[in-house]
Amino acid sequence: MSGAKPFVLCLTGSLGMGKSTAAKFFAEAGVPVHDSDAVVHTLYEGEAVAAIAAAFPGTTSGGKVDRSKLATKVIDDQAALARLEAIVHPLVAKARDKFLADAQARSAPVVVLDIPLLFEIGGEGSCDAVVVVSAPADMQRTRAFERPGMTEEKFATLLAKQVPDEEKRRRADFIVDSSRGYDYARAQVRDILRAIANMPRKR
């Protein structure tokens, strides 16, 4: 391993806030981005399949996890969710550690960890700074219901499991307002990258 450790910028935001779009803007600016959700998708097609099949019979087919079947097993069952997290979280952490080591080896000055449930899992300690992507509640709702399969019940359940946006904003080092269009959000990302050049590290 060579090079200094990169500045770790953690990106988070509630359902429908535009976090994925903000992540793309960081990537456009040349920043390596680690997408936790994408890692989980990969695990559900490979490394995690056997363990999930054993813990949740009937949730896999064709060598892959059926996400909708798995969701029905865990959405209202905290014990089942804890079992799933015990399988998935260590594998996600391993992938994240490899990403950080690779970034350090390439002497990347800054990286982004895209972690949807950053505050919910108490992950702030792995960050030098936290970026929260936010938008008004009515816009959040509209975006969320553009997703396939979204229902009132599912929306309410997902929101109930997330730290409220107001609290996320309060705990953020930076906020990206995604309500004013792509160009405005992209400019905010550039401003953040300039600002962190002079920020002390927290880790």
Model-predicted segments: where are they?
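Glycine-rich phosphate-binding loop of ATP-dependent small-molecule kinases
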Residues: 1-66, 194-203
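ATP-dependent NMP and nucleoside kinases share a basic, alpha-helical "lid"
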Residues: 97-106, 110-147
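Residue-level signature of catalytic and energy-coupling elements of molecular machines
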Residues: 84, 112, 176
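Hydrophobic "anchor" residues on beta-strands that sit immediately upstream
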Residues: 8, 31-33, 109-110, 124, ...
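Well-ordered beta-strand positions
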Residues: 32, 38, 129, 173-174
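Small-molecule kinase domains that catalyze NTP-dependent phosphoryl transfer to phosphate-bearing small molecules
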Residues: 125-126, 146, 150-203
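An amphipathic alpha-helix signature
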Residues: 49-53, 137-142, 152, 156
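ATP-dependent small-molecule kinase phosphotransfer cores
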Residues: 38, 42-109
